[in-house]
């Protein structure tokens, strides 16, 4: 199957997680013209597609068409991330969190979220 979705991002508004979500990195991806789908809570940006809360069946269909997701800093092995790995998606993680990678190492792509030049690493895959 052709993977025609660049990113699926699991976004949850939570007061304790707000500082962990890579808003700036998402904006840099949008500026670089990546196609981004947001699931769960809505991210207010006109260039992303918000799906909201969807069934696991529909999520699985989207994951089969997607290339990447972004690992959450507080839990890089969330159920969502593990499902993405089973659908052969690459997991983008901020380089400063690379020490958290213990399993499925080949599924992770380490990027400095502060350096926009590193977006080229994604485009080359």
Residue ranges and their predicted role:
Residues 2-47:
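Conserved catalytic-core segment of nucleotide-activated headgroup transferases in glycan assembly
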């Amino acid at each position: 199957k052709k993977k025609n979705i660049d990113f699926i991002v699991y976004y949850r508004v939570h007061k304790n997680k707000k500082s962990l979500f890579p808003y700036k990195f998402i904006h840099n991806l949008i500026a670089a013209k990546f196609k981004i789908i947001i699931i769960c809570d809505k991210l207010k940006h006109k260039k992303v597609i918000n799906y909201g809360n969807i069934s696991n069946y529909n999520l699985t269909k989207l994951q089969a068409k997607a290339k990447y997701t972004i690992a959450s800093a507080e839990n890089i092995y969330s159920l969502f991330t593990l499902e993405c790995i089973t659908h052969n998606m690459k997991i983008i993680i901020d380089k400063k969190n690379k020490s958290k990678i213990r399993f499925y190492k080949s599924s992770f792509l380490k990027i400095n979220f502060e350096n926009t030049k590193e977006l080229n690493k994604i485009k080359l895959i």
